[in-house]
Amino acid sequence: MKKIMMIGYGAMAREVLSRLPDGVSVGWILARAAHHAAIDSAFGGQVQALTHPDQCTEQPDLVLECASQQAVAEFGEAVVTRGWPLAVISTGALADAALQQRLQQACRQHQGQLIVLSGAVAGMDGLASAREGGLDSVTYQACKSPASWRGSMAEQLIDLDAVSEAQVFFEGSAREAARLFPANANVAATIALNGLGMDATRVRLLVDPATRRNTHRLQVCGNFGEFQIELSGNPLASNPKTSTLAALSAVQACRRLVDGGFIA
């Protein structure tokens, strides 16, 4: 039986926990103290609720972050300096170049592992392969409903209540998108990490009142040729900012743990 530590206890974390494959159990959940009573109740005291990785006296087989960019920044180094493998869904945290460098250095020094999950997008294996031959351009476009953009910087850039058709409200780099939209733009960061990097990856964000799905379009050109991917995914019912596929990518990470581990 493989035992994981979960960072987070929000909508995505709970979705992942409800879908853990056979052979994987959760031993620890790192979350704010306000969630600890709910964790104890949900798991009958069989799962240890933590506020910091230091409180874990055993070694998890995998630490799975399903919380936020802030959680990656706050706890990531503490995890990898213990030599624990850390899988992150909030990849936008790595738009902070200093944080990314610290995490990579800690992994080298302490035999840790930083695993970038694919999240809500497909084709990252092909993108990373294409990078080996040289990339000319990588462009990512995300289109979501007004509900998916509420509570984000989008509210300062466009009137979400008045929009009547699909409209672009942001164009810029993946680094800018990850910084301005920390709960919405992890896909942009994931694409950047597998492709041209945070500054050269171009991002366009749209709102469409007619859609109920999160649509991701990726266009890649390079010496290999070119490819385009379009993925129209359902958001989590419990959190419209989060794509169901992102949660499933975390579940699949757990399955890989059982089936023979990760290829980094």
Curated annotation (Swiss-Prot):
E.C. number(s) listed in UniProt: 1.4.1.21
Keywords: NAD, NADP, Oxidoreductase, Pyridine nucleotide biosynthesis
Pathway: Cofactor biosynthesis; NAD(+) biosynthesis; iminoaspartate from L-aspartate (dehydrogenase route): step 1/1
Superkingdom, taxonomy of origin: Bacteria
SUPFAM superfamilies attached to this UniProt entry: Glyceraldehyde-3-phosphate dehydrogenase-like, C-terminal domain (SSF55347), NAD(P)-binding Rossmann-fold domains (SSF51735)
Pfam families: Asp_DH_C, NAD_binding_3
PANTHER family: ASPARTATE DEHYDROGENASE DOMAIN-CONTAINING PROTEIN, L-ASPARTATE DEHYDROGENASE-RELATED
Biological function: Specifically catalyzes the NAD or NADP-dependent dehydrogenation of L-aspartate to iminoaspartate.
The protein's name in its UniProt record: L-aspartate dehydrogenase
Source species of the chain: Serratia proteamaculans (strain 568)
